[in-house]
Amino acid sequence: GKVGGDPGYDPLAFAIAECHKRGMECHAWMVTIPLGNRKHVAALGKESVTKKKRAICVPYKREYFLNPGHPQTKEYLMSLVREVVERYDVDGIHFDYLRYPENAPRFPDSYDYRKYSKGRSLAQWRRDNLTEIVRYIYKGVKAMKPWVKVSTCPVGKYKDTSRYPSRGWNAFHTVYQDVQGWLGEGIQDQIYPMLYFRGNHFYPFALDWQEQSNGRQIIPGLGIYFLDPSEGNWTLDEIERQMHFIRAHGLAGEAHYRV
């Protein structure tokens, strides 16, 4: 496709109609914090958010990101969500990349940290920034259409569990997602943790999500793409065991990434 081109129809309206014909729900998938590399941004020209909302955008490692620490970022994201929820009969809003870049000590938010942190550590302030975005959008969606589900796909391991360590890569510390805090506050309807692992890197963490769900739906994302010989050459029974585990322990279902 070409950026800005008119396909001659409304793709989202088409997808919703076709899903509903088949008794399926349609959730609008929205990438949140990353904006793309310089080439992607340049292709959008004056339509890029980096031009329209320069104050909330920051460059980092040859890419552009929304700055979660800027108060106007949640307003901008809510404006996008509002357009979708008001105009379309979607069943849900699903957020991807609602996180900081991985291990980003030099992410350029020092000015906002000094201005807004109020004595919190940098890590806690960043976690609070993401939580405030989640809270603000969740409440906004429910005020418009209470039946629309709000969900996120976070990093698959929340943090170390009593059963098994996360080995230094987790939602809480690596990308500042306090997802179990969101569940505890009730500001997510569903969580799709990206559990693209197997063995001890899958089962203890899937169980941890379910135990901390606060009655919300936990739907693990399974790494179906690892069945491809060029990706991981997993055997089919690996995925089958994960599916049986999910059903046996009462999780709400599974998502398949990527088919």
Task: Please identify what each model-predicted range represents.
Residues 179-202, 216-259:
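Substrate-binding cleft of secreted/luminal carbohydrate-active enzymes
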Residues 2-17, 27-87, 173-174:
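Active-site-adjacent "subsite" loops/lids of carbohydrate-active enzymes
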Residues 19, 77, 84, 93-96, ...:
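Conserved, mostly hydrophobic/aromatic
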Residues 144, 149-192, 197-208, 231:
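Substrate-binding cleft/loops of secretory-pathway carbohydrate-active enzymes
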Residues 34-50, 70, 83, 87-125:
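Active-site-proximal loop/short-helix segments
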Residues 1-9, 60-78, 119-130, 189-198, ...:
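The substrate-binding groove and active-site-proximal loops of carbohydrate-active enzymes
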Residues 12-16, 81-85, 131-139, 179-180, ...:
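Generic structural signal for well-ordered alpha-helices
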Residues 16, 20, 24-37, 94-101, ...:
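Aromatic-lined carbohydrate-recognition surfaces of secreted/lumenal glycan-active proteins
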